[in-house]
Amino acid sequence: MMGTYVDLRIYDEGKEEVLDLAVERIEELENKLSMNDSNSEIFEINEKAGQSAVQVSEDVFPLIKKSAEYSETNKDGFDYTIGPIVNLWRIGYDDARKPSQEEIDKALPLVNEQNVELDADEQTVFLKKNDMRLDLGAIAKGYITDEAIKVFEENDVTTGSVDLGGNIVIRGNSPSRDEGGWNVGVQNPFTERGGIVGFLNLKDQSIVTSGIYERYLEEDGKQYHHLLSPETGYPFDNEIAGVTIISDYSTDGDALSTAVFALGLEGGLNYVNKEKGIEAIFVTKDKDIYTSDGVTDNFNLSDDEFNWINE
């Protein structure tokens, strides 16, 4: 499912059927949002680029609208029209390769959120240029995670969790204690999913990590990760190995984990410390850890290979 693992947990008695409802919701949204499924709404939008507007469902339009907002406010790091660049690199697929500079130069003019026309009344999406491509890979998992947890809420689940490939949302108190949040691991960006550098105590919140560990291409002795810049067409190149975002909604955490990664350590910390309801943990390539102001007292380092710079 979604090309990644899905872990749904409910601790309320008699609510087992809600797991099935949540899985159905995840599959429903995946079918609508996939770039590669010829029956999906995103595929149709991309196929009709430069030709005609496409009317989309009430599930898809809000996500595209949110993607447009993030693309407008985080131009250097998040752009949902980055599809032509993603298709060149194909990082994470068997045919991944480093494209030529000529190919990148040809594709970059197609990456521009200003060339998407949205009609909220008709719920239509129009890509103005031929060969434009939407890619919601930096936000869709978060949106689907939020929708799955919404199924829990609608069915009166008080304690549970949704984990879609590392996009985690926690609901209610920890099942191992009467009061208090869950101890949730912060991903180690140098290992596979599940390796952690420390813990946070969370309740009714989302945690999302973007990093160089997830998908990458090795060519000519150099590693190219999957977080691609809409400005250069190459992977972001800074001191960060991983960024973990803590927020109320996974949609925001997903988008911001990429956008904040793009800003680098200093810019990312400054951005997060000014934003309400958002916290972050940064892990650098030198294995230093920096925490935003609101999460410093909540983070517990568990791996002594890392140095927590608690300023």
Region roles according to the model:
Residues 1-311:
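Mature catalytic core of soluble alpha/beta enzymes
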